[in-house]
């Protein structure tokens, strides 16, 4: 039976549960449950702390896991990404007191507080910088005010928390993170339950990033319309009662789909409809 780790709480938890549910897997009914057995799909789910998931997967105790790219990278565990899941996006950056034009090189000789010490040490080593890394389990922003650190490295979303503590982010992102599906590096690839879960989740993620466009199109502009909506292999064409018109159906990326609809309307297409897709296979 396939053994899969899922975040038990935090920003990744609900999105991970939603994707697995959409993919046809059982959800836990009580937030206190640590395991859920899904015999129909030959899977057992284990609900763990997000930062521990890569350790369990890397050790081979669990087959797959959903966690953050930043957490997996900081763990140092021998895991590989199978899928990017498109949720929980954030950047991991250095920050220091506002009022100075900071550069990463300014960190040399300073104390840096972070909850991701391995990511920070690797980045400093790659840059040839010598700084003291102080590991904290949370609320690293307050460490400068308390005199524990001179700068921090932390996950940055809107930047509101940094501004509240009069801090400013600087330098490039150390890690652009999001939810990812991981497995142990070098793990066997021939488990049917494993492959089924990966393909189901891949189909859900793809569906969340695309939608279906339907429209009626005069044959005189069909070639130009198809260039705007080429679909995956090619668009579906269906004859209408009027022989001079056809119905067109094609999948397009959600990003920019309104511009595509505008362009089709300007070209002369009619009854242009966009609809969501729940899941996809064989793409």
Swiss-Prot record:
Could you tell me which InterPro entries the record lists for this protein?
A: ATP-PRT_HisG_long, ATP_PRibTrfase_cat, ATP_PRibTrfase_CS, ATP_PRibTrfase_HisG, HisG_C, N-reg_PII-like_a/b, N-reg_PII/ATP_PRibTrfase_C
Record pathway: Amino-acid biosynthesis; L-histidine biosynthesis; L-histidine from 5-phospho-alpha-D-ribose 1-diphosphate: step 1/9
Enumerate the catalysed reactions: 1-(5-phospho-beta-D-ribosyl)-ATP + diphosphate = 5-phospho-alpha-D-ribose 1-diphosphate + ATP
Please name every pair of cysteines joined by a disulfide bond in this record.
Answer: none
Q: How is its activity regulated?
A: Feedback inhibited by histidine.
Query: What organism is the protein native to?
Result: Rhodococcus erythropolis (strain PR4 / NBRC 100887)
Q: Which GO terms describe its biological process?
A: L-histidine biosynthetic process
Q: NCBIfam families, per this entry? A: hisG, HisG_C-term
Q: Function, please?
A: Catalyzes the condensation of ATP and 5-phosphoribose 1-diphosphate to form N'-(5'-phosphoribosyl)-ATP (PR-ATP). Has a crucial role in the pathway because the rate of histidine biosynthesis seems to be controlled primarily by regulation of HisG enzymatic activity.
Q: What is this protein called?
A: ATP phosphoribosyltransferase
């Amino acid at each position: 039976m396939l053994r899969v780790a899922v975040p038990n709480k935090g920003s990744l938890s609900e999105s991970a549960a939603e994707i697995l549910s959409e993919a046809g897997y059982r959800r836990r009914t009580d937030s206190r449950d640590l395991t859920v057995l899904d015999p129909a799909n030959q899977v057992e789910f284990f609900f763990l702390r997000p930062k521990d998931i890569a350790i369990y997967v890397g050790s081979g105790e669990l087959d797959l896991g959903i966690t953050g790219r930043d957490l997996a990278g900081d763990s140092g565990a021998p895991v590989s990404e199978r899928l990017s899941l498109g949720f929980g996006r954030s950047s991991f950056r250095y920050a220091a007191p506002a009022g100075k034009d900071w550069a990463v090189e300014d960190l040399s000789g300073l104390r840096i507080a972070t909850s991701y010490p391995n990511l920070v040490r690797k980045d400093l080593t790659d840059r040839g910088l010598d700084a003291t890394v102080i590991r904290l389990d949370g609320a690293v922003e307050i460490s400068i005010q308390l005199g524990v650190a001179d700068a921090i490295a932390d996950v940055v979303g809107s930047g509101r928390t940094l501004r509240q503590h009069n801090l400013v982010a600087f330098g490039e992102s150390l890690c652009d993170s999001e939810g990812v599906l991981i497995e142990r590096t070098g793990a066997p690839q021939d488990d049917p339950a494993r492959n089924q879960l990966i393909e189901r989740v891949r189909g859900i993620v793809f569906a969340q990033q695309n939608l279906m466009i339907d429209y009626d199109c005069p044959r005189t502009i069909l070639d130009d319309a198809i260039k705007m909506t080429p679909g995956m292999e090619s668009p579906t064409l269906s004859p209408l009662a009027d022989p001079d018109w056809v119905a067109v159906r094609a999948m397009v990326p959600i990003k920019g789909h309104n511009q595509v609809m505008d362009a089709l309307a300007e070209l002369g297409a009619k009854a242009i409809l966009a609809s969501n897709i729940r899941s996809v296979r064989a793409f």
